[in-house]
Amino acid sequence: EQGFENSVVGADKAVVVVNPEITSVRDADRVIGKLDAKGLEDHAVIVNRLNYEMTKRGDTLDVPDIIETLSVKLLGVVPDDRSITVSTNKGEPIVLDDKAQSGQAFKNIARRLNGEEVPLLKLGSESTGLFSAIRRLFKKN
């Protein structure tokens, strides 16, 4: 409790990071309630480690459910990306990897924090690429 109190003293804005898991969303809901009780109502959420395939199968919560549950604005979605592990082990920031969706997601979040209007990335197999397009064609038939 005291750590939370110390972290919000003097804050005028808060960013809550949540994983697409029920326990994480419950914890985030408690934190948002405490922020509101402290009068800190300017807050947003980042959904971290979103696995598109698991979400599509219904194995994890999806972004609209998370946002509806928490009743906050969405600042960004960071996909669960193996590139993060690789870049971390190399000691290199993921934002330097132009091919990593997670790196682009972090850049977009930073731009949104600076007031820019940046659309959310399309995540998962429905994004781009020849094989994705072929897969979608076969799924329709």
Annotate each predicted stretch with a short phrase.
Residues K90-Q104:
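C-terminal boundary of histidine-terminating zinc-finger modules
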Residues E1-D80, V86:
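Conserved catalytic-core segment of NTP-binding enzymes
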Residues T23, L61, Q101-Q104, N108:
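Generic recognition of short, well-ordered alpha-helical interface segments
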Residues K73, E92, N108-N141:
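P-loop NTP-binding site
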Residues D62-D65, Q101, G129, A133:
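Exposed alpha-helical structural elements
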